[in-house]
A protein has these predicted regions:
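Short, Lys/Arg-enriched N-terminal segments with co-localized hydrophobic residues
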Residues: 1-9
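Residue-identity detector for glutamine
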Residues: 3-4, 154-155, 222, 313
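Active-site-proximal alpha/beta segments of enzymes that process anionic O-linked groups
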Residues: 178-243, 251-320
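Generic enzyme active-site microenvironment
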Residues: 248
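Transmembrane and membrane-interface helices of multi-pass
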Residues: 8-199
Length: 320
C-alpha cells in the first residue's frame, strides 16, 4: 500500500512536459488576461461595445494585445534565456499590474522617472503585505510553474522556425484586428487615452524606451535665469549662511485640506502655526518627476515642459 501511495504521489506531482511554443503562449495568455484587469475593466465599461459588433471590437483588442505581448517576449525565447526571460517578464508585469490596479497609476516615462530617481527610504514606503502577496500570486507563482514545467526542446533550426511562425501569427493577428476593427479601436483609444499607458506589459516597455531616449538626448547646456537677483535688505547682514528648510509634500491633494474648506479635520497639526495658505495653486502633473520641479520653475504651469525645465535653472539655483 505504501508503494502504491508513492506511485500515486509521483503521478500527481509529475512535471508536465510542454513544447516551448506552448509554454510561451500560455504565459502570454496569462499576462493578457490576469495582469490587465484594469485595462479590461475600462474596455468592457466603454459605451457602444454591446452586441455582435462590440464583441468583435473587444476580440480585436484582445488579439492586438496578445500579439504585441507575444512579439515582446519572442526575443527572450532562446533556450538559455527562455525561463529567466519569462520569469523577469512575469514579475515586472505583476508589479506593474499592482500599481495600475491598486493605485490607479499609468505607466509612462514620467512614472518611471519617479521610480528610477527615488531613494531607498522612499521606495521602502511602497512595500506592504498586499503588494508582496499580489506580486507573489500573479508573478512568482506563474514563474514557479515556468521553472517546474519541462520544456521539450527541438533541434535549434526547428525551434527558430517555430518562433518565426509565432511572429507571423502575431503580425497576422495585428493585421486582422486593424483591417476589421481598426477605426473602432482607434476611436476607443482616443476616448480613453489611458489605455495605452496601462496595457501591460507593452506600456512598461514603451515607457522604458521613452525614458532611455529622453536620457540619451540629455546633453543640452544649462540655461541660467535670475541673473539680476541680489540679496535683499530684509535678510540679516553678515557672512553667516542663511538656512532655508523646505518640507515638500507634492502629492497632497489640495481639495482634501480643511484649510481649503474640506469638511474633515485633515490638517489639525497646522492650525496652531502661522500658516500662509495658497488655496488656488495647481500642480503641473500627478507624478513627482513633473510636479516637484515645476514648483520651482519660472516657466509656469501652462508653459512647463519637463525636457526644457531639466536644462534650465529654477528658483533654488537662484537662491543658492
Amino acid at each position: 500500500r505504501r508503494h502504491q501511495n508513492n506511485r500515486m504521489s509521483n503521478h500527481i506531482l509529475k512535471r508536465p512536459t510542454l513544447g516551448a511554443n506552448v509554454l510561451l503562449l500560455l504565459v502570454v495568455a496569462f499576462i493578457v488576461v490576469a495582469l490587465n484587469t484594469r485595462f479590461w475593466g475600462i474596455v468592457f465599461d466603454s459605451p457602444g461595445l454591446a452586441g455582435l459588433h462590440g464583441s468583435g471590437v473587444i476580440a480585436a483588442i484582445a488579439a492586438a494585445l496578445f500579439a504585441l505581448t507575444l512579439l515582446m517576449v519572442l526575443p527572450l525565447s532562446l533556450r538559455w534565456t527562455f525561463k529567466p526571460g519569462l520569469t523577469l517578464v512575469l514579475i515586472l508585469a505583476a508589479g506593474a499590474a499592482y500599481f495600475i490596479g491598486d493605485y490607479g497609476a499609468v505607466i509612462d516615462r514620467h512614472a518611471l522617472a519617479s521610480v528610477y530617481e527615488t531613494d531607498a527610504r522612499e521606495a521602502g514606503e511602497w512595500l506592504n503585505l498586499r503588494m508582496l502577496l499580489s506580486i507573489g500570486a500573479l508573478g512568482l507563482l506563474p514563474a514557479a510553474f515556468v521553472w517546474w514545467a519541462r520544456v521539450d526542446w527541438q533541434q535549434p533550426t526547428r525551434e527558430i522556425f517555430s518562433r518565426l511562425k509565432l511572429a507571423l501569427l502575431a503580425f497576422a493577428l495585428l493585421g486582422v484586428a486593424a483591417l476589421g476593427f481598426g477605426k473602432d479601436v482607434a476611436s476607443l483609444l482616443r476616448n480613453h487615452m489611458e489605455l495605452r499607458h496601462i496595457a501591460n506589459p507593452f506600456a512598461l516597455l514603451a515607457a522604458n524606451l521613452s525614458y532611455l531616449d529622453h536620457a540619451r538626448n540629455d546633453n543640452r547646456p544649462l540655461a541660467k535665469v535670475g541673473l539680476d537677483a541680489r540679496r535683499g535688505a530684509a535678510l540679516p547682514p553678515g557672512d553667516r549662511p542663511l538656512v532655508l528648510v523646505l518640507a515638500i509634500g507634492e502629492s497632497m491633494r489640495a481639495a482634501s485640506l480643511d484649510l481649503n474648506g474640506y469638511a474633515r479635520d485633515t490638517d489639525f497639526d497646522l492650525h496652531p502655526l502661522p500658516v500662509v495658505n495658497f488655496g488656488k495653486v495647481s500642480s503641473c502633473g500627478t507624478n513627482t518627476a513633473t510636479s516637484l520641479p515645476c514648483m520651482f520653475s519660472d516657466l509656469g504651469r501652462r508653459g512647463y515642459d519637463d525636457a526644457t525645465a531639466k536644462h534650465r535653472e529654477n528658483v533654488l539655483d537662484v537662491l543658492v
